[in-house]
Each structure stands twice: as C-alpha cells, then as structure tokens.
C-alpha cells in the first residue's frame, strides 16, 4: 500500500512538472509570435498581450469613482492621500489611479517600464519593410504590449499634487493616415489606462483616408470588441492633418477637446493637469510636456524639463528659457507663447469661438502658429502643464509622399502671416522672399473673424507675450562667428555632416574643395547663437556627456546654449564645449569625431574655419 502511494505521488509530481514546463515554453513561444500572416504577403498583428500574455482590454467607466489610497510597495515614493495632505480642502482631490499604477509597477516584458527593446536576430528584412512605410521601427512596436508600462518621470512634487474635485469631461481626437496598427491602438489604450475613471467621454480616431486594409474593417472590429467609447470617423478623400483634426472635433461631445498624434503614449495621471486650468477659465489652453519615444527601440525618455515655445523669423519652432518665477514653481503651469504642435487641450466651446483651425490651411504646417497667435491675441491664455506628460515618436523620416500641391507649407505660413502678424510679416518675407508670390487663398473670413473677436495686434503679442524673443531670435540677426568648411589640422580632412538627421552622428571626409565631383555637407556655421550647425539647416552639434570620447550628435537647434554651446579659440584652434569643458577631437584613421580633454599640443583638436569673424569672436 505504502509503495503504491509513493508511486502515485511520483506520477502526480511528474505530471505537474510537465504541465508547468509546457506552460512556460508556450508563453515563451507566443511572446515572439506577434504577427499573423495574411494572404497577400503582409503581416497583421494579433490582439495585444501584456507581459503575462493575457491582457484584458482597458476598462471603460461611466462615472467617476472615489479616490483610493491603495498602493503597491513599488509606489512608496508617492505620498499617501489624506484629508490634510498638501494643504488640501474639500474642494480638491487626489486623482491618481493607484490600482493602475500598482499594476504597472510590477509589469515585465518587452518595452515595459519604457525600456528599450531590441528585436531578435533574423527579422531584419521584415523590420526594413515596415520601416519604409512608417518611418520608425514598427516591428519593435508589434512585440511590445499595447498596455505597456511607462516610467513616472514627473517632478516628484507632481505625485503629491491635488486638483479640483469637479473636472470637465474630455473628448480625445486622434487624427491618423496609414498609422501603424499597434502604435495607433497603443495611443488609445494608454489614454484609457492612465486617465481617471469617468473623465474620458470618448476617443475619436479621425481617419484621413487611409488605404491600409487593416485600418478599415479589422480596426472597426477590434474597437467594437475591446472598447465602448472609442470610435472611428473617416474622410471620403485625403484632407490633411489640419482638416482631419477638425473632422474629429466636429464629432466630439466632451467639454474639452484634447488633440493627440496617432503615435503617442499618455503617461501617469496626465489628464487632470490638462483639465484643471480649463475648469478655472475656459479660455485657457493647456499643453502637456512632450517626451520622446525612440523611433528605433521605443525607449521612453524626457525631452527636457520645460521651455516656452516660440519661433524664429522663418517660422521654425524654437524654445525660450523658463522665467525665474516658473523655475521656482516646477509643478505649476507656465505661460508659453507658442504650442509645439498637435498635443493640447482646449475647451470645446472656446475652440469653436475661435473658429477652430483655419480650414484654408493645407495638409500640415503653420497651424500651431495660427492657433497660438489667435489664442493670445483674441483674449485667451496658453500654458504648459509640467505634471502632464505624453510620449511622442519623432519619426526617423517622413514616410508619406509629397501630396503634389506645391509649397503648401510656405502657402500656409503666408496665410498665417497675412492674417495675424501685421507689419512683422515683413521679417518673414525678408528671409523667405518667395512667400510673397504664393497665393494664400481667400482671407476674407479669417480677417473678419479677427475683427469680430476684437483681437489685439501682433505688436502687443511680441511685447507682452513673447517679450524676450528678440534677445534670442532677433528680427535683424547679428553676424555669425565663423563659417565655411572646417578642416582638421592633423588629418587635412573636413567635418562632413552628410545631411544626417536628428540624433545621428557625423564624421570626417575628404574636403570637397580638394576632390571635385564628391558630394557632402561641409559648409558649417558657428552662429551668433553660439552653436555649430550645417549652413541653411536647423540641426546643431550636441554633446550630452562629459565622458572622454563622448559622441557628438546632431539635434534640433534650441538656442538655449547648454549641450549646444560652443566657443572657438583663434589661438589654439580649439572648438571648446563649455558645459563639459572638453574639446572637439577626431581620429584621423577612422574619421570618427568625438570629445576629449583639451590639450593644445594635440593636433587632432585643431580646427580651421574657412572664414572667421575676428571682431565678433573678440566680443564673444
């Protein structure tokens, strides 16, 4: 009897081990089987999986639920809500969704916690196929859960911040054209997962005439199965980003319109900081901090810790430093002259009082200036909310073909300038003379709107709102410090940025003047902003590490010094980087460009500009 019992126990134990091993092997297998083959040679992602490969669709709530103080051990840094925490009153509340935060704190898997994800070997061909049509690593996105967790990178004070108890409802409008399946659905999923219960009235996916089959019936079927407050509206012809936003906004029923791009991820408690300023004054427009989702690995990181939006006189978006009062209150909204683009919240009532977007603007470009100028000049206020953070994929390249309607961006800029910029438009035309000859279309309705709303002058905007812009981006620019080719004394080679883009490295190459027939980008400028950039482009030499041999990257010029501040020494011929106290160096054999400890005896650190403004450098 005893022997039979032992045999039985042994059999049961063996069976349990077999079941457990089979389960683990199955999970490992399915986590990498993210794509189903569809006839026609394409791959359709399956329904999303979380780190445990068993994720329920995001919950939908019909009314706000009471705040909870339940937290995971991972959230010890978050202050426990209490009736007297942070000077709270009966009129405010803690809007954090602690159960969701607790769930995310323990999530593990590809891309979880916003970590970089690297594809397994053998998928290069499939990766490149998707890269070409998306401008980012869409295959990596397919391996990452739609419900993926993100790091809470807000200022610590945001975790204790309370907001008014009664907040308006929001309609989130997401325009898209041929967006990749998983990035589009992750956008919607992140909004629902990280928004307090009951505040999201609806998510409207505004389809700008996509032609991908999976964005038609498969998308509608998926939404019908997994969501109740997400729906798609479709254009019957290609309208462009601006009119697609308007199409979605016209379907909205929430108190507040929130516009997001179709490859974004809302972060922890992102919504209350956007809604509270509008609840207090419906003519306040609120923008979140925009974080970076890496286009290659989907790693999530901060772009910076705040700056005020602005522009130069070619209407490139620029940034102004925070004011001292803003720096002293790092969790409070601060005024900003210009929004960065398409991520913002605005009262639905106020949006239509302002006439929405100008429907005469084609495709994209200029709409952020048109709306920003209109808000400020017509009695509104615009702020950035540091405690609201949304990640955004900045594509490696634009995958969509030119619509074939000429210089639509220039036309849009002229349209904005003629309606809103008054005499200041001449500064734009001085830099872009051909804009004068572009047909802006009929401006009658827009000029009548400005008159009806009794809007202020652009001079008022420049003096009262963007008052410090002339010191950073003057209408009449001072002379640059140095320009032309930059030749290394040791190697005789020139710095060649090779038309590289943001977050890319560059190197040395034979000087174009020495070898005719070669192509490259060797005309550089040490500008009056004290940055170094390719002539006629707005990407700058950027160093983010003080390590020896640190790389030099190209990054969008921000005019705020820091990583992009450079000084040229006409005696030592050094290109000195003050924030790291290192000098530009190179390897003559590998042609690599990097940073090193400054040494006047090292010839690889000596750089010869083709033209030098000695007077300007003497007054640097």
Set out the residue ranges of the language-model regions.
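N-terminal signal-anchor transmembrane helix specifying type II single-pass membrane topology
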Residues: 1-59
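Cell-envelope/extracellular polymer assembly enzymes that use nucleotide-activated donors
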Residues: 168-173, 202, 370
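Acidic donor-binding segment of Leloir-type glycosyltransferases
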Residues: 192-234
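Glycine-rich, basic loop-to-helix element that forms the pyrophosphate-binding segment
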Residues: 236-252
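A recurrent flexible, glycine/aromatic-enriched loop bordering the glycosyltransferase active site
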Residues: 242, 316-345
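Short aromatic/hydrophobic "clamp" motif used to bind/position activated sugar donors
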Residues: 257
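Conserved donor NDP-sugar-binding/catalytic core segment of glycosyltransferases
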Residues: 265, 269-317, 381, 387
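Lectin-like carbohydrate-binding module/patch detector with strong preference for beta-trefoil
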Residues: 470-620
